[in-house]
Amino acid sequence: MANSLLTISMITREAIELFVNSNAFIKNLDRQYDDDFGKKGAKIGSQLRIRLPNDYTVRTGPAVSIQDTAEQQTVLTLATQDGVDVSFSTADLLLSLDDFSERVMLPMMNNLAGGVAGTIMANSANTICNMAQNADAAGNILTPTSGTYLDAAATLAINSTPISAQKIINDPRTEARVVTSLSGLLNPTTAISDQYYEGMMYKALGATWFSDQTVLKFTTGTFTTGTLNGVPTVTGSTALTVSAITGTLAVGDIVTIAGVNAVNRVTKLSTGEPRQFVVTVAMVANATVLNVYPSLVPSSTGVAGGPAVQYQTVDASPASNATVTLYTNNGAAQTYRKSFRYAPQAITMATGDLPLPANKVVARHKYDNVSMRAITDYMIGTDQEITRLDVLFGSLVIRPEWMCVVPDKV
């Protein structure tokens, strides 16, 4: 009995499952799929509107204190179309699906998933506005300890991050260092065995651990000194006027402002700890505008202990000459591996159905909220039959405060 050829539908179905399962970062994101795109096909630039969680304040006493529901939303754009294009021989298509998957599809999907994950990481890592670091007295970043990861967990808790299903993504080199130092730390015997045999942490310190090659190596700015020049006059300010700074700040740097402490996002009470902000626009030496996230939303009176407000982020407005400090400041630029602890809901990856051209050999499948399209066609110019597999996707950090950088020295 003659072998049957693998069909494009079989190839696509196998490819999408391999794609989702071959990259740890993609597996541990919030993945969304909008079937509205399936009616006419999605294209680069298609958008999804995402509502953010509402926030309210609590009254004390029987008197009603009505507050508006001030809904916030953001837009996720399907901005990137990635794919892999190959020529299959008839001999390839006569293989069993298992053989074809191992020899051809697995390396294709591993690289495609890695490329997509790299794009998402590049768009996400430098939006994180929290950091828990292990540093020496001079401010030099060291390899994180168990206390560093637990400090990150505490920071996430203060920001009302969901406790269940938290993840820790490490650079592979960081993972190796951490497994060595934490391998015997109050773990069940089976977990210690897994660490010994596999060289991975798996589950520890309230999170599921994994390593991924997409983790960024980040270089800080050379910032040494800077002060605010006036008090922000608008609640929710993200652009702060400063005196000409000494040194530089990079997008993704973490800074604090003297006298501006974080608040618990549920109780709105001050934590007594400096609120960390992420720099969103790079600053050169002598620049005078500091752009940050989150926005500065103090109490209604602008002073610590004042009446709470919706979406409050800090306990008080800064003084007009408050000092700005680079959190990783040791007097020079530092390069570190930007591992982080996070809730999967912090980052959303969305995909849409690409259109299916008429009169072509095509297939499209969805698996675990990821859509992939395949097209096979004959190229008359090169006398080849080629197949292309495409994913149209976009990503957005919905809640940067639900992530916390755990840096490791390079």
Give the residues covered by each predicted segment.
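Short, low-complexity, charged/polar segments at coil/turn and helix-coil boundaries
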Residues: 33-42, 146-181
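Internal mixed-charge
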Residues: 203, 211, 273-402
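Autoprocessing Asn-cyclization modules and mimics
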Residues: 176-295, 299, 312-319, 405-407
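Structural signal for terminal/edge beta-strands and the immediately following C-terminal loop/tail
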Residues: 400-410
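Short, Lys/Arg-rich flexible segments
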Residues: 2-33, 90-95, 108, 116-133, ...
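Alpha-helical scaffold segments that mediate packing/assembly in large oligomeric complexes
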Residues: 95-103, 107-161, 174, 214-244, ...
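N-terminal "assembly arms/tails" that initiate or stabilize quaternary assembly
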Residues: 1-74, 403
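Long, contiguous amphipathic alpha-helices that act as assembly "spine/axial" helices in icosahedral shell
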Residues: 50, 76-134, 140, 157-174, ...
